[in-house]
From Swiss-Prot:
The lineage of its organism: Bacteria, Pseudomonadati, Planctomycetota, Planctomycetia, Pirellulales. It holds the Pfam family Amidohydro_1. This is Putative dihydroorotase. Keywords: Hydrolase, Pyrimidine biosynthesis. CDD domains: DHOase_IIa (cd01317). Catalyzes the reversible cyclization of carbamoyl aspartate to dihydroorotate.
Amino acid sequence: MVVGQRERKRRCIRGEPLMNDTTWVLDGGRLIDPANGIDRIARLVLHEGKVHSIDTPDGDVPPDAGRLDVTGKIVAPGLVDLATELREPGSEEDETIQTGSNAALAGGYTTVLCCSSTKPLMDSAASVQLVRQIAQRVDGVRVLPIACLSKGRQAEQMAELGILAAAGAAGFSDTPRPMPNDALLKRALDYCRMFDLPIFDRPEVPELADGGVMHDGQIGLILGLKGLPTEAEDLAVARDVRLAEATKGRLHVGPVSTMGSIDMIGRVKSRGIHISASVCPHNLFGSDELLRSYDSRYKVHPPMRSPSHVEALRNAVAEGVIDAIESGHMPRAQEKKANDLDLAPFGASALETTLAAIATDLVETKILPWSRAIECLSTAPARIAGVKGGTLSVGANADVTVIDPLNAWSVEAKEFRSRCHSSPMTGRTLTARVTHTLVGGRLKFELHPTVASAAS
């Protein structure tokens, strides 16, 4: 049964589902499903949590079905994020699974892979199960834990990967830390082939990056801030691609931010080596020039690089060298970010702005068509992670994102659903906004003219 506007607002405040209809009809929208090569005006019918049909005649639609008029909007598979920090348990001052889920839904995400930035770390079956249990209680976005690759995230001993996989881990990583132990990474890549689960590596050589604040370039020299050299990333990527080639394991490298990384990844892909890579939105729009303000909201990781790197990254996304775009959501409490640039932590809130930033910086500028943008934000991440999603195929989970491509809005971080209100996008006018997010056929987010609402 469809509920009224006042009841929707009440449910939003209480964190309850907005709608419970078992059947939804989305009429008049531009259906974009890169997995099936679909990009046309079509009717989409969802039933009992699954994609039921496309272009169903009126006579075959139940009369009591919930209906959404999405004329002029884009209907896409729900977005999938490869690396989201939700910070719970242990750092709830930064983010909780509830607030992070609300932010994800408002950004069009239906599935997020949750990094092990928790306390306790996700290096035991109990800690993985705890995150899954909290996420189930929240009942918002789908949360898939990425367990630690090494015990205690110390890069000394391999974690008990088999036990973690059995507990529900969707993959393994020491993110946000890199993996400096070459031998451990090689063993893990070999071992994970038994589970067919991916390993995610954040490429960086710690000894070269230690103490760095921003891109190691002319701007950093002028500002007197220690740099994060491109070589720190390039050398790690070189190691990663060689190990991926040697082991044939499932290795994802990202986020990347340098021309050197792109060059190496492109060359190994041309030889048929299976490796995937991702990039963050902040590396596709802003350069290190923004750090002249000494504003800690621009202290993100990977750091904003010089304009030549930004241009190369954009081209790499367009050409398919970079497979996916991840949000880079690393929430940190305002009292932590409100510090001198060299003392403030890396991090930013990004789930609510990623799609709009890509639409503004890559689609509006004709670098990407909408189909490629959706592929990078949904289809490719689902494929890389090996999870259900990223498609509107009949029988697939009814995870759907509806986008108004012409909705221009000003980013005000204080209005974020995330607990973190630090964002490099603050003050920008972005084009395109999510209007509806459905997870498993349930309407979890709806943007109203007078109130923006996210439901669990």
